[in-house]
Every structure is written in C-alpha cells, then in structure tokens.
Amino acid sequence: MTISDLRKTDNFFLLAGPCVIEGEEMALRIADRIVKITDKLGIPYVFKGSYRNANRSRLDSFTGIGDEKALKVLRKIRETFDIPIVTDIHSAGEAAMAAEYVDVLQIPAFLCRQTDLLVAAAHTGKIVNIKKGQFLSPGAMRFAADKVVEAGNDQVMLTERGTTFGYQDLIVDYRGIPEMQTLGFPVILDVTHSLQQPNQTAGVTGGMPQLIETVAKAGIAVGVDGLFMETHEDPSVAKSDGANMLKLDLLEGLLTKLVRIRQVL
C-alpha cells in the first residue's frame, strides 16, 4: 500500500480503532462496524490498534495481551476485511517485526525526534506516520520527515495531536495543519488524543470526549487530509485511553456530518 491509495477519492481518509488490542473478538467486531460505515460513506479506511501500549503513566497500567498475540490479531483483521493496518512502534528493534503484520508504522509523539526509530521505520518500506510532539512547532516536523525521506522512504504522513498547554491540558492550533501541509506530506488530525488531559494526580490520563465532534469538524473545515480517532464499544471499560475515546455507536453519525462538511469545501 502507498499513500496514494488513501487519497484516491476527494474524501478525507480515516485511521480508527481501539487504543490497544484488548482481545481478538472485540477487535474484529470494531473493525467490522467501521468497515461497514466507511464503505457506506466512501471513506478510505485504515484500522488502528496498538499491539503494545508502552507509554503509560503507571507500572500497573495495561500495556497489551502480548506482542505476538496482538500482532496476529492485527494480521487477522487485515486478511478478514482486506484493509490496511496501522500500529505504533516504540524502538528501532520493533520496526521490522511489526512491518510483517501491518501497512503503516506510527511514531508516537513523544518519540518523533528519535533518529534511530525513524530510520528503522523508513527502512521497512512501509508508510511512516509521524505524530507531532506536543512540544514541537509544526514547522519543526520537517526535520523528522526529512530523516525518513533521507533514509530512502518518501511515504510519510504527519499527524497533529495537540500542543501542551500548561501542565494538564492540550490545545490544537489549527494554523499548524496548513503549515505542515506545505512540507509536502499528508496531514492527519488526531482528534481523540488532542482532547487528552495528561498528568493527572491519579496517574490516569483524563479527557474531554464531549468535544470530539467540535475538534473533528474544525479539522475538516481547515482542510486536513485525514482523521485519526480511537473508538471503543464502551469507553468506560476500555483498558487504555477510555477517557478520551469516541463511543463506537456515535461514529457513523459523526462521520456523516464530516463528509457533508468536506463536500462543501
């Protein structure tokens, strides 16, 4: 798969799924629901699921069901629904392993400056989606992208996921989306992570899911190429990032509104 496959229509494309793979049956159900919705609306779709959630606040936080088991779930989704898959990697040693199962390797925001990680991802030949660090300016993302390109891979996407605002909040500066687009790469808005409220005293990240629709609509209005959203059948029992996820039952209604906005641009 190449980026051109995601841009084959005038619509935005979507990266969506649970934060982390919690089990095969649930992941398959979520994928099935989203495939039916995106097919109906004509939205190019990539299933998102982390096989390991390494960035957690506490040692006792859930990180996954085991790398091999979770990667096999991702491969099953890929084969069952004939859709591309995106997953996060956290070290250079994970790149080649994950690339055997997925189509897009995602670089977490906190790791977007890690040269060895970016180069290892580039060398797989997969699409590399780099999330903008909460501490970086939009323009500074060209240096992260350049590392991948100079390593021989021009299949790069950039993702806006909010900027640190004080100690326990993030904001989206929508001016950064067209600024990053001038770098020559597709730009994605990570709607749900942009609504996180990090560094809470309980050691569990908070969120403002009631603003998901607002942030997503604004992203489409400014011309973002794709959207990233984490979704779950019941966010209240999700094992990671439930506080800022979109309930799966709300996805079709939201995407329908977003497609209408896109059509008038």
Can you say where each PLM-predicted feature lies in the sequence?
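Active-site mouth loops of central-metabolism enzymes
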Residues: 16-29, 57-65, 83-88, 107-109, ...
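Catalytic alpha/beta core domains of metabolic enzymes, predominantly
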Residues: 7, 125, 129-231
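Conserved beta-strand positions in the central sheet of alpha/beta enzyme cores
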Residues: 15, 46-48, 86, 106, ...
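N-terminal amphipathic alpha-helix/helix-capping segment at the start of soluble metabolic enzymes
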Residues: 1-15, 72, 263-265
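Catalytic beta/alpha-barrel core
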Residues: 65-66, 80-94, 103-116, 127-138, ...
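A short alpha/beta connector and helix-capping loop motif
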Residues: 27-31, 35, 95, 100-110, ...
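Alpha-helix-loop-beta-strand connector modules within alpha/beta enzyme cores
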Residues: 33-41, 60-86, 121-127, 177-187, ...
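Glycine-rich, proline-tolerant flexible connector loops at the mouths of alpha/beta enzymes
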Residues: 14-27, 45-67, 231-241
